[in-house]
Amino acid sequence: ILNEERKYWIYIPETKAGEKGKAYPVLYLLDGDSFFHSVVGFTRFFSSSKTSNLPPCIVVAVLNTDRTRDFTPTCSAARRDGTICPYDKPAGGGAEQFHRFLIEELRLEVENKVPANGTNFLVGHSYAGLFTLQTLSNHPESFDSYIAIDPSLWWDRGVFLQQAAKNVYQKDF
């Protein structure tokens, strides 16, 4: 779908005695090359805590090749402050194609390799947080839970917020 080879890392929780064949939820982590170790540590710590409801999770860290292309909903030359410089080349707009890759290619490949239980989380930060919200807005059935950390809502002069406002009234979340 993306016409390129994508790398990813996988963490599988340790199986305890008597839990052979146990399946786990899968947390898909965008910007995986930046956050893999901290998210694995977080899930290990909180899934072993008696005060947390987080179950042990498989973590699939999706590595980046072009964040702007993959995580943004529109092609834009607008800067963070909304201005457009005539020398800036428009970029981005590949979020829908990247969503197809996640669901139609990566998820199928992962589910053939790991003991997944069918529950899936999507986690993204910044541009990936924008992608996470875009996926929730346009394809809410794709994941069971969404975590968007500091999403880049400024992208293309706030186009996501404009689209999401329309979607809220058209969809049943």
Give a label for each model feature.
Residues 1-173:
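Non-catalytic cap/lid and distal C-terminal segments of serine-dependent acyl enzymes
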